[in-house]
């Protein structure tokens, strides 16, 4: 059995050794939930990796979006090159959920483009979990969404080994039952037979196939072949073919499921007709009958997940199977950026239910489709294994779950300390922001200003522009591609000041920023809560000269808590640097060079009209914007962005 072994040129430093020790000892004592409070740049990922290495248990790391998950995945792969590090996120390149808008009588069919590589990685993840112990899965919150039964997925595998006797026709039938397609084209999830040679392209491989050579009904040899070069890369003693779908179902079980679907359909049609909903009755009858016929013929259909209650043998309202059900009971779970991820997990169920209820009411789906859903928060809580919440600003939920006990990691390898916080009167704040900005710009640095309203951001931007400051603003009305272009301009110095409303959601990581100005810091609310203030203050922590000015006529409870926490961290960091002779250095980070092949994008009031590159990251940002509209039931806006994605995908760099 393989063991976790970190490969790194660096050893644990600063607070890392103590954090690793405390977390590991807590797990050993049976502590179910712990908090790692780690400031940005302190090496939280290395700490997580070290705990996994110490405990030698399978691990799941949950991030709040695909981009962050991808970063963590790459880091973990570097730390564990000889172990199974897997990536499990939604496999849609874009996704417009099925929806119905009653007021305009518009039905929007589910429209999705499945990313084949991500689908392959999902299969690789579930296969690794079921076959080995040295596995780390980095996932987005999609890991709490419904997935096929792990028991069926595991039971329906086809083990093949040298010397094994198996009828060729029987093997082909089994592969078809696992949703593999027969054909001459060699692509993932297919197989072909030429004479006594069966070539299988496994669901979890990107470019390797298995070549099974038979002598009569006996397997003579098994080779792993590079599909691009046609060269054998390994001779294998045995392989296990996993299903090409997580919703694969044995034929007898499938027929039982179809019978139950038929029963529900008849009840549904009778109910619609009884309530004089003739159109809805005909609609559900036609759509469901078509799906039933497809499943009878091929074992699957479009939207098969909506019948998961029956396919997985679940009772009405019973929690769906998810990735969590595939994991061993002794697995470790890390919730990264828990102050964002936990609220996201909490909100998933309700948004999904509202959308599906609309479809059911108007005859587009059977009521059982409600069971194709994410876990409720309570269900997720009941499935938690040994868990570590990771954040620079843990939320109330996390600290309550651990009775206020946290493991701190405050020291950065670069020696950078948290910025100095200054409180100034709110009266006259505009004039002072201008003066402070000009002074900071003259030293070659950038400025971030956070305002409370879009109008204030626009007015301040206009005022600064009139006096010759290169400025732009960001808020929710600024489109994704424009937003990315503005941030790039700030990094390169085309813009010196960036004004925003909620700069937290921009994910700004700007080493050139030496000043953050928080206007109306004493106006209590989400944007001026303790967590938001600490996160905003952290925007200046990438620069050794970082300062934060909070404009307020009174010091609120949130302000005091945020400033006290920042000062506490700074004192710890300065003391450590002094004791170890460390001189802080600003982070050096290259500006992305992906703005070369350009297409025209409409400019904003905050910047001149110019062009912006369309990269993979651009498309991902738009997809997130589209999903946000869909979650808010703004399906027409989501549809508009989906169309924009389709156009821009043709211009990706």
From Swiss-Prot:
The record's annotation in SMART domains points to: DEXDc, HELICc
Provide the binding site for ATP.
38-45
Positions of short motif Beta-hairpin: 91-114
Q: Which GO terms are recorded in the biological process aspect for this UniProt protein? A: nucleotide-excision repair; SOS response
Q: Write out the GO cellular component annotations.
A: cytoplasm; excinuclease repair complex
Write out the annotated subcellular location: Cytoplasm
Residue intervals of the Helicase C-terminal domain: 429-591
Q: Which Gene Ontology MF annotations are present?
A: ATP binding; ATP hydrolysis activity; DNA binding; excinuclease ABC activity; helicase activity
Q: Which UniProt keywords apply?
A: ATP-binding, Cytoplasm, DNA damage, DNA excision, DNA repair, Excision nuclease, Helicase, Hydrolase, Nucleotide-binding, SOS response
Helicase ATP-binding domain location is: 25-182
Domain UVR, first and last residues per copy: 616-651
The job of this chain, per UniProt, is described as: The UvrABC repair system catalyzes the recognition and processing of DNA lesions. A damage recognition complex composed of 2 UvrA and 2 UvrB subunits scans DNA for abnormalities. Upon binding of the UvrA(2)B(2) complex to a putative damaged site, the DNA wraps around one UvrB monomer. DNA wrap is dependent on ATP binding by UvrB and probably causes local melting of the DNA helix, facilitating insertion of UvrB beta-hairpin between the DNA strands. Then UvrB probes one DNA strand for the presence of a lesion.
Q: Which PANTHER family match?
A: UVRABC SYSTEM PROTEIN B (PTHR24029:SF0)
Assembly and oligomerization: Forms a heterotetramer with UvrA during the search for lesions. Interacts with UvrC in an incision complex.
NCBIfam families, from UniProt? Answer: PRK05298.1 (NF003673), uvrb (TIGR00631)
Query: Which family does this protein fall into?
Result: Belongs to the UvrB family.
Quote the entry's note on domains. The beta-hairpin motif is involved in DNA binding.
Q: What is this protein called?
A: UvrABC system protein B
Q: Which organism is it from?
A: Anaplasma phagocytophilum (strain HZ)
């Amino acid at each position: 059995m393989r063991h976790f072994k970190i490969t790194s040129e660096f050893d644990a430093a600063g607070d890392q050794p103590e954090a690793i020790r405390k977390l590991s000892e807590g797990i050993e004592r049976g502590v179910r939930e712990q908090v790692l409070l780690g400031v940005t740049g302190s090496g939280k990922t290395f700490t997580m990796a070290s705990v996994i290495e110490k405990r030698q248990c399978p691990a799941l790391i949950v991030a709040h979006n695909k981009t962050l998950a991808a970063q963590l995945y790459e880091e973990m792969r570097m730390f564990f090159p000889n172990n199974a590090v897997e990536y499990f996120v939604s496999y849609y390149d874009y996704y417009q959920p099925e929806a119905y808008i009653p007021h305009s009588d518009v039905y929007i069919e589910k429209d999705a483009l499945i990313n084949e590589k991500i689908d392959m990685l999902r299969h690789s993840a579930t296969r690794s979990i079921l076959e080995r112990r040295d596995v780390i899965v980095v996932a987005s919150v999609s890991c709490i969404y419904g997935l096929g039964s792990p028991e069926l997925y595991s039971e329906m595998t086809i083990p093949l080994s040298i010397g094994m006797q198996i009828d060729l026709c029987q093997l082909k039938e089994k592969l078809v039952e696992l949703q593999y397609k027969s054909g001459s084209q060699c692509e993932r999830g297919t197989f072909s037979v030429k004479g006594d040679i069966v070539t299988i392209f496994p669901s979890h491989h990107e470019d390797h196939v298995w070549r099974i050579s038979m002598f009569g009904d006996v397997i003579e040899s098994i080779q792993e072949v590079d599909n691009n070069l046609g060269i054998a890369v390994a001779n294998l003693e045995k392989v296990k073919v996993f299903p090409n779908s997580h919703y694969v179902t044995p034929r007898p079980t499938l027929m039982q499921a179809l019978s139950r679907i038929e029963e529900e359909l008849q009840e549904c049609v009778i109910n619609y007709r009884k309530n004089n909903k003739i159109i809805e009755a005909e609609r559900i009858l036609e759509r469901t009958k078509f799906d039933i016929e497809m499943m009878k013929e091929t074992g699957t259909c479009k939207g098969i997940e909506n019948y998961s209650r029956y396919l997985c043998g679940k009772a009405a309202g019973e929690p769906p199977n998810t990735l969590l059900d595939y994991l061993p009971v002794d697995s470790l779970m890390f919730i990264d950026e828990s102050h964002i991820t936990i609220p996201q997990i909490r909100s998933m169920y309700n948004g999904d239910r509202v959308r599906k209820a609309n479809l059911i009411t108007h005859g587009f789906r059977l009521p059982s489709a409600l069971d194709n859903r994410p876990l409720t928060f309570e269900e997720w809580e009941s499935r938690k294994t040994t868990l570590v919440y990771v954040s620079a600003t843990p939320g109330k939920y996390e600290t309550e779950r651990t009775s206020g006990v946290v493991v701190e990691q405050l020291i950065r390898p670069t020696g950078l300390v948290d910025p100095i916080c200054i409180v100034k009167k709110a009266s006259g704040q505009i004039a002072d922001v201008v003066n402070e900005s000009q002074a900071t710009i003259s030293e070659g640095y950038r400025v971030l200003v956070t305002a409370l309203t879009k109008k204030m951001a626009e007015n301040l931007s206009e005022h600064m522009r009139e006096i010759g400051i290169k400025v732009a603003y960001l808020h929710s009305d600024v489109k994704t591609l424009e937003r990315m272009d503005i941030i790039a301009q700030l990094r390169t110095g085309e813009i010196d000041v960036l004004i925003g409303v909620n700069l937290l959601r921009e994910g700004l990581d700007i080493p050139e920023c030496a000043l953050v100005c928080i206007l109306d810091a004493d106006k209590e609310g989400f944007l001026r809560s303790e967590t938001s203030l600490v996160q905003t203050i952290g925007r200046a922590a990438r620069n050794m000269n970082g300062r934060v000015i909070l404009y307020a006529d009174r010091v609120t409870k949130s302000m005091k808590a945020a400033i006290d926490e920042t000062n506490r961290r700074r004192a710890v960091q300065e003391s450590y640097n002094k004791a170890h002779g460390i001189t802080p250095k600003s982070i050096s980070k290259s500006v992305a060079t992906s703005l070369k092949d350009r297409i025209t994008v409409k400019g904003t009031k905050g910047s001149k009209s110019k062009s912006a590159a369309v990269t993979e990251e651009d498309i991902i940002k738009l997809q997130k914007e589209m999903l946000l509209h869909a979650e808010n039931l703004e399906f027409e806006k989501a549809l508009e962005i989906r169309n924009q994605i389709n156009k821009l995908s043709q211009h990706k760099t």
